[in-house]
């Protein structure tokens, strides 16, 4: 059985508000909206994680890794090395169901 499946309902695919994407299970910080970009795959795509330990990786084949939450192990999707929007950047394809979005709160001056 493939780690990657598509059942539709990728609510974050075309979602580009400012904020942060966290693990849907434990709330650990995974991706910033600044690293999100449009891609032809059916899943939300990111170029980098927030923290070095945001995800754990298991090599699936050369240049492709299964990624899980670095804190709780929740299955997130895949990283494709050097397949991002610019040379040298990765493409993280992540299941919307594995993410929770936290909008950026504008600071109010008092």
UniProtKB/Swiss-Prot annotation:
Zn(2+) binds at residues 23, 26, 69, 72. It is found in: Cytoplasm; Nucleus; Cytoplasm, Cytoskeleton. Its cofactor is Zn(2+). It holds the Pfam family SelR. The active site is at residue 93. It comes from Danio rerio (Zebrafish). Its EC number is 1.8.4.12, 1.8.4.14. This is Methionine-R-sulfoxide reductase B1-A. InterPro entries: Met_Sox_Rdtase_MsrB_dom, MsrB_Met_sulfoxide_reductase, Mss4-like_sf. One of its GO terms (cellular component) is cytoskeleton. Methionine-sulfoxide reductase that specifically reduces methionine (R)-sulfoxide back to methionine. While in many cases, methionine oxidation is the result of random oxidation following oxidative stress, methionine oxidation is also a post-translational modification that takes place on specific residue. Acts as a regulator of actin assembly by reducing methionine (R)-sulfoxide mediated by MICALs (mical1, mical2 or mical3) on actin, thereby promoting filament repolymerization. Plays a role in innate immunity by reducing oxidized actin, leading to actin repolymerization in macrophages. Keywords: Cytoplasm, Cytoskeleton, Immunity, Innate immunity, Metal-binding, Nucleus, Oxidoreductase, Selenocysteine, Zinc. Belongs to the MsrB Met sulfoxide reductase family.
């Amino acid at each position: 059985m493939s780690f990657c499946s598509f059942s539709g309902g990728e609510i974050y695919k075309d979602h580009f508000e400012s904020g942060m994407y966290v693990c849907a299970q434990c709330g650990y910080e995974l991706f910033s909206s600044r690293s999100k970009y449009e891609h032809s795959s059916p899943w939300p795509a990111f170029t980098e994680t927030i923290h070095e330990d945001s995800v754990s990786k298991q090599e699936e084949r050369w240049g492709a890794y299964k990624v899980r939450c670095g804190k709780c192990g929740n299955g997130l999707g895949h990283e494709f090395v050097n397949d991002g929007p610019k040379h040298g950047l990765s493409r993280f394809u992540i299941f919307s169901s594995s993410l929770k979005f936290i909008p950026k709160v504008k600071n109010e001056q008092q």
